[in-house]
């Protein structure tokens, strides 16, 4: 059946989708390289008069290309209102109490590499970059160019802003940065998003095609049942071969109201349940597409016990007729099983009557089949 071909096409489509997403998955594996991230233990000391307050915690994360070593010094922010250190002429007021110092720089305005380069050229042993406002204490490993013997660490915005304001108030703050724990990250957030979207899309297409396949199988079974019913139903409709001497081939005889051609000898006509008759090749597609008699509008399929869903359309029925019925109901078989004998030997004869006074069928003849009992 044609529907089986459609189902096969849908299966091929699903298989092609599976291949495509499989290739995408293999390509994505090349992006899934393990990366190492090192956290930073920071011992921050606040010198207030003769008192020193220390704070120790794993509050930072090293940059991707940072030197991994221990470093200590005074924390020094840039002078002025702009704290991003994007200007090569940025000035850092170095403390006279320590030879080593760590630059405290705000994120934004330029790349991390530019900030680190400015601080390294000014003599900083390390660079502490704090995150954007509104990010809390969120940190991430920065991508930047490698600088020899320069430690690069990111801390959260809250901690960085707190240190900056205390320094502006005259508090001397020192920090000792040590290498913390190592974390291995197998996938970045871009790859995670890609995997999630790919998996969701793949799952959708799998379930979609499974659903369509189930519907196609159900529809195939329904068409098979309908084929059998139509074969049995059309077998109930009588067929007749028009022969020489029949009234239908007289000069004043009737013509088929579907093709408007006169009946000729050896024409095969089908007699409907309403007793109207037409060319078999004309009326069969008509019944499948309209379901009614062209003259009296009698619902032929309903009379024969066939229920067809309107929403399925008429084209599938015509396809079904051409692909199934024509293979099983050949004219020779139909003539053998359903042919009505000629008028002289049968008790049923076709008569054609003109009904010129009919208002509903002004141009269409009225054909009936009457029972005729031969005289003894």
Swiss-Prot record:
Catalytic reaction list = S-ubiquitinyl-[E2 ubiquitin-conjugating enzyme]-L-cysteine + [acceptor protein]-L-lysine = [E2 ubiquitin-conjugating enzyme]-L-cysteine + N(6)-ubiquitinyl-[acceptor protein]-L-lysine
Which GO terms fall under biological process for this protein?
protein ubiquitination
One family from Pfam that matches here is zf-RING_2
Top-level lineage group: Eukaryota
What subcellular compartments does it reside in?
A: Endoplasmic reticulum membrane
Residue ranges of region Disordered? 328-376
Q: Which UniProt keywords apply?
A: Endoplasmic reticulum, Membrane, Metal-binding, Transferase, Transmembrane, Transmembrane helix, Ubl conjugation, Ubl conjugation pathway, Zinc, Zinc-finger
Q: What is its EC number?
A: 2.3.2.27
Write down the InterPro entries for this protein, in alphabetical order: PA_dom_sf, PA_domain, Znf_RING, Znf_RING/FYVE/PHD
> Which residues belong to zinc fingers classed as RING-type?
256-297
Extract the GO molecular function terms from the UniProt entry. transferase activity; zinc ion binding
Q: Name one GO cellular component term.
A: endoplasmic reticulum membrane
Membrane-spanning parts:
190-210
According to Swiss-Prot or TrEMBL, what is its membrane topology? Single-pass membrane protein
Q: Report the PTM annotation.
A: Auto-ubiquitinated.
| Major localization listed first in the record, in broad terms | endoplasmic reticulum
Cross-referenced PROSITE patterns, in alphabetical order? ZF_RING_2 (PS50089)
Q: Where is the composition biased (Polar residues)?
A: 355-366
What the protein does comes down to:
Has E3 ubiquitin-protein ligase activity. Plays a role in male fecundity through the interaction with the E2 ubituitin-protein ligase UBE2J1.
User: Subunit notes for this chain?
Assistant: Interacts with E3 ligase UBE2J1.
Protein name, please? E3 ubiquitin-protein ligase RNF133
Protein source organism:
Macaca fascicularis
Q: Which gene encodes it?
A: RNF133
